[in-house]
Swiss-Prot record:
GO molecular function, one term: nutrient reservoir activity
Residues linked to a glycan: N494, N706
Similarity comment text for this entry: Belongs to the hemocyanin family.
Claim: Acetylation is one of the keywords in the record: no
Cellular location(s): Secreted, Extracellular space
Coiled coil region boundaries: none
Protein name: Sex-specific storage-protein 1
Keyword Secreted: yes
Annotated SUPFAM superfamilies: Di-copper centre-containing domain, E set domains, Hemocyanin, N-terminal domain
Gene3D superfamilies in the record: Di-copper center containing domain from catechol oxidase (1.10.1280.10), Hemocyanin, C-terminal domain (2.60.40.1520), Hemocyanin, N-terminal domain (1.20.1370.10)
Keyword annotations: Glycoprotein, Secreted, Signal, Storage protein
InterPro entries the record matches: Di-copper_centre_dom_sf, Hemocyanin/hexamerin, Hemocyanin/hexamerin_mid_dom, Hemocyanin_C, Hemocyanin_C_sf, Hemocyanin_N, Hemocyanin_N_sf, Ig_E-set
Amino acid sequence: MRVLVLLACLAAASASAISGGYGTMVFTKEPMVNLDMKMKELCIMKLLDHILQPTMFEDIKEIAKEYNIEKSCDKYMNVDVVKQFMEMYKMGMLPRGETFVHTNELQMEEAVKVFRVLYYAKDFDVFMRTACWMRERINGGMFVYAFTAACFHRTDCKGLYLPAPYEIYPYFFVDSHVISKAFMMKMTKAAKDPVLWKYYGITVTDDNLVVIDWRKGVRRSLSQNDVMSYFMEDVDLNTYMYYLHMNYPFWMTDDAYGINKERRGEIMMYANQQLLARMRLERLSHKMCDVKPMMWNEPLETGYWPKIRLPSGDEMPVRQNNMVVATKDNLKMKQMMDDVEMMIREGILTGKIERRDGTVISLKKSEDIENLARLVLGGLEIVGDDAKVIHLTNLMKKMLSYGQYNMDKYTYVPTSLDMYTTCLRDPVFWMIMKRVCNIFTVFKNMLPKYTREQFSFPGVKVEKITTDELVTFVDEYDMDISNAMYLDATEMQNKTSDMTFMARMRRLNHHPFQVSIDVMSDKTVDAVVRIFLGPKYDCMGRLMSVNDKRLDMFELDSFMYKLVNGKNTIVRSSMDMQGFIPEYLSTRRVMESEMMPSGDGQTMVKDWWCKSRNGFPQRLMLPLGTIGGLEMQMYVIVSPVRTGMLLPTLDMTMMKDRCACRWSSCISTMPLGYPFDRPIDMASFFTSNMKFADVMIYRKDLGMSNTSKTVDTSEMVMMKDDLTYLDSDMLVKRTYKDVMMMSSMMN
């Protein structure tokens, strides 16, 4: 009963928010220049609502019909980009209904031209009118991509809320069986069928809120890596990867955008390395060894079943185990990839790379990592045309795609590797990242090791590190997938969907904790505090040396702290650690706050905005751990504030203004990852301003994880690891207690 009451309240609130908010006429014939934050956000949310079909809002239709881009060239800061776009538009673009693919050169070239028109609009009014025009004419996926990138980089969009990508385009984040069940409920108008609902895990309230249990489906397992699906397929983790690309698109090489003055290359490099470090910790929870780098001349043992259904109705292709990677069909691609990788590696060894135009890129100093990372990950072209940036990571992903079978230029069926929203789901992408990060490791190994003076902080001593008990658990989350459904004529006329669809998933989380650090100082001084979490033992149970695990240290926090003379007790809550986002706000929740006359919602969204652009999911701060406790180590180093170690073209002030500060990038010019980014001379390493501490990470017993919840999930089909990797008993109804008894016997 409590479940129905809770869901009914949610449905009522959602319906009220949508009808009250989206029904507001925000697009007008008068200039939309002086709109407040609330109205701007309403504009964005209406534009991105049900993107797969023409808009249901009359104000958007009217603007799209009356506005003429070609006759409004004077309203754009760069007339040439408008002319180039219109020439392309008249020649024909990716049709509506096709899937926009991030690694397809032709489609990406079109998307870049769309972005430039949006970006160079002189003011918010022109920006919105252009977006309305494009919303009704170009491919929905391409529009979302270009519009999102424009919102990330336009100054008049600073602080504005963007719906989470998994709410805009649920197809790339939800298993296909969930989408199919939602369509079934939509077509039958949720006709009562208790037996089928119970079998499929579907709950329907009187207010037509449909909740579909994600886990009530057959799990296809092709390799041992599928046990990690709860982590790799986490919607917030994949959003993090997508937004990382949106902050620094590989094709954005022009200085006009301003991001070339940021530490974009180093940030992208370190983000990839940190993802690998976080994956290593998660694998240790399952006693799995490290990810192996991709090898092109060997059969690929790891297959993958994406379970993703595209809006066109096609399924993302399955990659079988033991696939032969290098074939006669992709020989040219492999030769190009090998040549580019060899050129970069030779450049590291010789200390320079000469580009086709004769300019030389130096790769000798620590700060040169910026240019190296841009060469490898995008942002610095080898050839002159930025639409054809030779992007090594993209070349590697395309090697494993099925592009050679897509004979038509527009009917391209992507693999999971082809999309920034799905690539983390595929175990092979982590192998690609491992190979790419090995390039940076080679560069770092060529640099001098840090000296004792670079490690130490005279007069400062870290005396003790203590933490609360570190406990993880699996919780439930309802994700709104209503935008995956098509609206019928009546719903279009009523400006709202008759039903709200939610996918109920189970995801990794942890209890909040605090880290307490006791520091003695003989002076008052500003300091940079860095906190890392890393392994103590490898997958075989062997004690790891500092050099063995330095690339597996996951950076939890980095912040400025003013030390005073004497004892300093630094207390950091996991909720306040820099670079993590607690939760992506749901669009329905934001709509409710937008309707508040007090403006509390605006303050909430504004405070949350910076983290939404950069934040790693706070839920995934800790690895799963084990019921008996997984032993790891926490490391703290207190360092002086150092400056003057960056390329002269970089501007940390601009990074702060754009909320692009990740880790210690805006508070110190030391390389990201310091002190673990280079091989360590153990004779110089251990100084008084650093300390290791053993910690245990406990996984909460399955029977305890839902004791305080109002939603009764005791009849859910479970399995040994309490996650998403189901066994052959998946159709047998068992209680939590039954499963835990089975689990203990199996252990």
